[in-house]
Amino acid sequence: MCIRDRFNIDEFDNYIEFQNISLKLIRNELSNDKSLIGFTGGPITLYHFATRNNPISQTLFQQTLPILEMLIQKNIQIQLQNDIDLLMIFDTEANKLNDKEFDEFVIPFLIKISNNYPNKIGYFTKEISQSKFNKLQKLENLKLTVLGTNLGVFNELPKTHLSLQGNFSNDLLTLEDTKSFSDSIDKYIDKCLQYEPSHRSGWIASLDHGVRKTTPEANVHLFIEKIRTRLS
């Protein structure tokens, strides 16, 4: 019996109910002028995280991928029931695929999801080839594509549904000396300010892979304050 035959989607539905409740509570507390963005991992990324990038048989990959896609589709459905403005699919590990694999394992899934939920789905990846980028540009119902790399992105911003994600190092975010941390943010923002506001349209300020447990909370507040005051 293969893995898929033993899989019960209802068990996942029950497990993820906490997220459904959480989103309802958040949406109810947010004012109408505040956006709520949901997120999930992409199938390839979830597979790599589950296997810790260990080389595993192609048979297991082929059995697992349809299940992951089913789980993600269900999760997206649940999140979009709660009036979120956009759902982002984070798929950093897709850069490990060659162009043929990207066409086979990523593009069909994105087409299906974006067609089911037109202009409600965004996609994030990084360090991909120009060929993969061109494929993403052709997905008409995909609301947003975010690339965590340059890839000539400054020339592409004015003419596509594309955003540039600039990651602020989470190593710097853990600095305990307030002045050193503040100086690091200022240098980061100074580089951004070298471009006109019109050129910065679509830019996203990101904390790389997020806030670590060792990150001082004051640093997170300072980062948000400086980004909002200096780049608004």
Segments (PLM) and residue ranges:
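Short, small-residue-biased leader/transition segments that mark boundaries at the very start
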Residues: 1-3
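Active-site-adjacent beta->alpha loops and helix N-cap segments on the catalytic face
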Residues: 20-22, 97-110, 131, 150-162
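Alpha/beta enzyme core
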Residues: 54-87, 99, 107, 111-119, ...
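Catalytic-face loop-and-helix region of soluble metabolic enzyme cores
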Residues: 114-232
